Every structure is written in structure tokens, then in C-alpha cells.
């Protein structure tokens, strides 16, 4: 159990988990206040109104476990929570019985019935929070919204405001050790957002870049943080024991073997593209813009290469440590 506690503490530190001191404030549900916010609808006056998203450690762990259970298939779930000013607070989450593929999730009638029954039963046991968003996984290709995701989120924001979309990459979570997660809200149709600075760089596979580029200006990311309290510590410990055993008994080198191979192939294609563009650029004089674009692609490919290498080394180090802990036989006595 000591090892489990250390692993849990490491996970909390890796994801910058904050312990809430004023427990009653964040866990108390003020129905009147929430109704006043819903009536005022401040997000209709400012399309960039919500800026922050807070997730409870319990909701986060449930989402990560669900996403990991799907493997290479996308999974989907719903989140319960409330609004506090410009912050969307996610208190809990639950999985939905949906059909998933490697590129999308499809919610059928049974999923909507399950959703309604779950929320109703949650209220009967004192969980008064409403549905505040949905989550789904992007196994191996990062946290962003595809064209289908943008359409789904736009529809949700049209009829179920306030609503947020959360994307988790379980494959990169296993590789990096830190939860790879993003929270997003879409802009209304026809709205042109102001030019923003460059967002944090993330590796996008070559076959997804077009989908990413076409829709990247139709939504924005919220600043994500995580919190916990002594109230949910016991539940978190019980849930962690299952998560920790799965993590300890698995190897990212084996679990993510296909992902790593795909990363290497994707990287080789990006390098070939960059090399071809640089080659063409050498025959064209005075086209500095073309050269800069080629060099930019080469720089991104270099960053992707470093990331893949670090993740592979991280997985190898984990295997060596586990081998030393569990498989080494003391031969000095022989």
C-alpha cells in the first residue's frame, strides 16, 4: 500500500492537483445561484466568456480509466457540474454505452435513455449538479476538436448551455505519465475570433492535420486545472488501487507498440515532405516565405522526433525499474 500511496502522490504532482481548503464552497450546490446564472446567460454577450475549467480528481480518474479501457477505439461520456463566474466546474463523470470506432463515437437512443436515467438517479442521492459537458477520447492523436466534434459541440451549446467539450488522449497519457487532456468551447456560426497568439504545440499525425487545420479557428481552449478534497479522498483511494494495479502490470512499450510504430512512420512522412519542399525551394530564388514554411515543418518534425524518443526512453526506464524491483534474483548466495 505504501507503493500505491507514492504512485498516487506522483500522479497528483504530475497533474498539478490542488487540494481545496474551503471544501464547502466548491462542493455546495446553490440551486438559486445556478438558476440566476442560467437566466442571465452571460455567455451570449461574450463568446469567450468561459475561460477556465476545473476538474475534480475523481472525475478525472474516472474519465482516464474509461478512455484507457477503450484501447484504440474512441469512447464517450458525460460530465456533471456547475458554473462559477467564468469557470466551469466538473464534479463527476460517467461513461455512456455508445458504439465507438477509431475515428468517431456514435450515440444511439439507448445512450440518451441511459444519460437521462443516470442524471435523475444522481439527483435522488443528493447529487444536484446538472450535465455540464461531454468527453471523448482521441487515442494517439492529441487533444483537439475534429469537424464532427465541432458540429456536436455547436449543437450542444445551442440547446444545452452552459456546455463544454473535453478530449482525452489515453495513449499519450500512458506514454508521458501525465494526463493528456483539453477542454474546449465552440464559437457561434459566422463568428470570426480575434487573432490569438500561437497555442501550445502538440503533435498532430499527418493524416489528421487537414481536419485539425480546417476547424481550429471554430473553437477555443479553456485553461484546465484539477482539484481534490478530503471529502473524496477515500473514493479516490479505492479507485486509485484499480488504476495503479493496471498501470503497474502494463508496459507502455508493449501497450503502445502500434502507437510508437505509427509515430515513427508519421515522422518519416513529415521529414520526406519537408525535404521535398526544401529541395524545391533551392531552385527558387527570392522565395523566403516558402523557405520559412519548409524550415518550420522541419522544426516541428524535429520536436515530434524528440517527443517520441523521450517517451520511448521513459517506457524503457519504467521497465528496467520494474525488473529491478520484481524480477531480480539474489544470486550472490549461490
Swiss-Prot record:
EC top class, as a word: hydrolase
GO BP field: negative regulation of apoptotic process; positive regulation of DNA-binding transcription factor activity; proteolysis; regulation of cell cycle; vestibular receptor cell development
An example Gene Ontology CC term for this record: nucleus
GO MF annotation terms: deNEDDylase activity; metal ion binding; metallopeptidase activity
Location(s) in or outside the cell: Cytoplasm, Cytosol; Nucleus; Cytoplasm, Perinuclear region; Cytoplasmic vesicle, Secretory vesicle, Synaptic vesicle
Gene3D superfamilies linked to this entry: Cytidine Deaminase, domain 2
Its biological purpose: Probable protease subunit of the COP9 signalosome complex (CSN), a complex involved in various cellular and developmental processes. The CSN complex is an essential regulator of the ubiquitin (Ubl) conjugation pathway by mediating the deneddylation of the cullin subunits of E3 ligase complexes, leading to modify the Ubl ligase activity. In the complex, it probably acts as the catalytic center that mediates the cleavage of nedd8 from cullins. It however has no metalloprotease activity by itself and requires the other subunits of the CSN complex.
Domain notes: The JAMM motif is essential for the protease activity of the CSN complex resulting in deneddylation of cullins. It constitutes the catalytic center of the complex.
Protein name listed in UniProt: COP9 signalosome complex subunit 5
